[in-house]
């Protein structure tokens, strides 16, 4: 039978290692975990953990391909409330900028556009994880920002 405390420690160590963004192979992760006292860890277990936690290979600051677990790369599921896909809402003098989980921006932008001018939205432009929304005539950027925050129940 598995020791839940040991499993929890393994998960914490695994996530901490990936935050360092310096491991380019599963073998390197295995060795690092073994050095931290997890003697029974192997490549297949690391592979399953990488998949389970949504790890991706990306370039770090040194332009090396490494495994990482960025929080903003949370994978949306069919049961995710839309508000969980919105990571940040900010604005300047012209537009409201909404940062979302990767792949969610067009879905959120479509929702915003469906609310229309009566709700203060002139239009939205969406990429993969960023939306630019501009207020309709008669609405300020601040009013639009507050309306979007209310819509997604974010704090000011």
Swiss-Prot record:
Principal place of residence: cytoplasm
Keyword 4Fe-4S recorded: no
Disulfide bond sites: none
Pathway: Amino-acid biosynthesis; L-arginine biosynthesis [regulation]
InterPro entries assigned to the protein according to its UniProt record, in alphabetical order: Arg_repress, Arg_repress_C, Arg_repress_C_sf, Arg_repress_DNA-bd, WH-like_DNA-bd_sf, WH_DNA-bd_sf
Keywords: Amino-acid biosynthesis, Arginine biosynthesis, Cytoplasm, DNA-binding, Repressor, Transcription, Transcription regulation
Function noted in UniProt: Regulates arginine biosynthesis genes.
Name recorded for this polypeptide: Arginine repressor
